[in-house]
Swiss-Prot record:
PANTHER family: PHOTOSYSTEM I REACTION CENTER SUBUNIT VIII, PTHR35775
Biological function: May help in the organization of the PsaL subunit.
Keyword rRNA processing on entry: no
Ranges annotated as spanning the membrane: 4-24
Gene behind this protein: psaI
InterPro entries, per database record: PSI_PsaI, PSI_PsaI_sf
Membrane topology type: Single-pass membrane protein
Protein name (database record): Photosystem I reaction center subunit VIII
Keywords from the UniProt entry: Chloroplast, Membrane, Photosynthesis, Photosystem I, Plastid, Thylakoid, Transmembrane, Transmembrane helix
Gene Ontology biological process terms from the UniProt entry: photosynthesis
Amino acid sequence: MTDFSLPSILVPLVGLVLPAIAMASLSLHVQKNKIV
């Protein structure tokens, strides 16, 4: 049962967390270097 419920929790979590981390690091990178 854990094997079936774990991917269904992990997949949306990774799908939401990874882009959020990428966006945050990108915005921090841009703010630090003042590219804009």
